[in-house]
Swiss-Prot record:
K(+) binds at residue 42. It comes from Bacteroides fragilis (strain ATCC 25285 / DSM 2151 / CCUG 4856 / JCM 11019 / LMG 10263 / NCTC 9343 / Onslow / VPI 2553 / EN-2). Its EC number is 2.5.1.6. The gene is metK. This is S-adenosylmethionine synthase. ATP binds at residues 14, 164-166, 254-255, 263, 269-270, 286, 290. Binds 2 divalent ions per subunit. HAMAP family: S_AdoMet_synth1 (MF_00086).
């Protein structure tokens, strides 16, 4: 007998993601002007208010208020009726200098001996059920919201859309872990109050709400989902769509009040959306707002890079990689591998872990260098997942009245590159 598995995603306008994007925009601006910056930037967003807090060690000076407002405007919070608007919201900063006690454990005369910025365990996961080696349920949940955001920005259809949205996808698997069909799709999207009640009675309000919901449900099924399906190239994934999918669209009946006005948002509260949608495991450390000396972020990217390259090389059909660190110590305490009984090599998971230790240098500075993490590459990670994205070169422009203008070429999502497949095949005799 098979089973059902569910993953969710949230849009760039979700309050927690607004916070993540502001934190990573601050990080990027600091790295653009001082690549050695040590940053831990936390953001809180609520009705008409942004609060920045955290610890920073940098030689750069940036306009935090301007950074926050630019992010909020780009997301789409540009109307006063949202009760959170880029030009009028307050921006408070309580950012201060990084602890000297932490810094002494990280800085070393030889940079390669740089210690981990904290203790903890980090996980990387990969599966061959999708072309990007991600869990299908999460991949589809992200895709739904990416297309929904495109529709909102185009402004031609579903013109009532507001920035906040969530999706959830449930997949049925057979006993062998192979996707069989899509069972349920949930889409909750914030919207304008585009149908007004005939009068002030509760009955008239209910009637207007029901009419709005009927329009939104019809548009999700007839406008959004066909565009989602059209964006998929893989025949096996397309075959999972069927006429019996259960759709839950705005199940509360109404979603006008949303974004940071509806719910307070905090950096680092969507760590499962950021990673593998509940598949694999998570060590608990969030990513956004942290420079790569924080192994919560850099080692999680490295573990994904390892798992993806090993699965792509054919070592296993599915793989979980754990690494752990002690603060101030460069080399990881352990490397753990779980192939879920789906290994394709005549080696134990422990032997695979030892091979990984030989192939990949997991000291923090080595990870930074290998994955090019000391560059302003993080804003793009802060919505729609840090994993499963497309590696690409982009040109970025930074402006500062304090530091001048800067233009640079950077490589995004380097941990998604399949650049170790040949080395892995050679090491494992594949």
């Amino acid at each position: 007998m098979g089973y059902l598995f569910t993953s969710e995603s949230v849009s760039e306008g979700h309050p927690d993601k607004v916070a993540d994007q502001i934190s990573d925009a601050v990080l990027d601006k600091l790295l653009a002007y001082d690549p050695s910056s040590k940053v831990a930037c936390e953001t809180l967003v609520t009705t008409g208010q942004v609060v920045l807090a955290g610890e920073v060690k940098t030689g750069a000076y940036v306009d935090l208020q301007l950074i926050a407002r630019e992010v909020i405007q780009k997301i789409g919070y540009t109307k006063g009726e949202y009760m959170f608007e880029s030009n009028s919201c307050g921006v408070l900063s309580a950012i201060h200098e990084q602890s000297a006690d932490i810094n002494r454990g990280v800085e070393r005369e030889d940079p390669m001996n740089q210690g981990a910025g904290d203790q903890g365990m980090m996980f990387g996961y990969a599966t061959n059920e999708t072309e990007n080696y991600m869990p299908l349920s999460l991949d589809l949940a992200h895709r739904i919201l990416l297309v929904l955001a495109d529709i909102r920005r185009e402004g031609k259809e579903m013109t009532y859309l507001r920035p906040d949205a969530k999706s959830q996808v449930t997949i049925e698997y057979d006993d062998n872990g192979t996707p069989v069909r899509i069972d349920t799709i949930v889409v909750s999207t914030q919207h304008d109050e585009f149908i007004l009640p005939a009068d002030n009675s509760a009955a008239a309000q209910l009637k207007a709400d029901e009419e709005m919901l009927a329009v939104i449900r019809k548009d999700v099924i007839e406008v959004l989902m066909p565009r989602v399906i059209a964006s998929i190239n893989h025949p096996k994934v397309l075959a999972l769509f069927n006429d019996h999918i259960i759709y839950h669209v705005n199940p509360t009946g109404k979603f006008v009040i949303g974004g940071p006005h509806g719910d307070t948002g905090l950096t680092g509260r969507k760590i499962i959306v950021d990673t593998y949608g509940g598949k694999g495991a998570h060590g608990g450390g969030a990513f956004s707002g942290k420079d790569p000396s924080k192994v919560d972020r850099s080692a999680a990217y490295a573990a994904r890079h390892i798992a993806k390259n090993l699965v792509a090389a054919g070592v296993a059909d599915e793989m979980l990689v754990q690494v752990s660190y002690a603060i101030g110590v460069a080399r990881p305490i352990n490397i753990y591998v779980n192939t879920y009984g789906r290994s394709n090599v005549k080696m134990s998971d422990g032997e695979i872990a030892r091979k990984i230790d030989e192939l990949f240098d997991l000291r923090p500075k080595a990870i930074e260098d290998r994955l090019k993490l000391r560059y302003p590459i993080y804003s793009e990670t802060a919505a729609y997942g840090h994993m499963g994205r497309e590696p690409q070169m982009v040109t970025k422009h930074f402006q500062s009245r304090y530091e001048g203008d800067r233009t640079m070429e950077v490589e995004l999502f380097t941990w998604e590159k399949l650049d170790y497949v040949d080395k892995v095949k050679a090491a494992f005799g594949l």
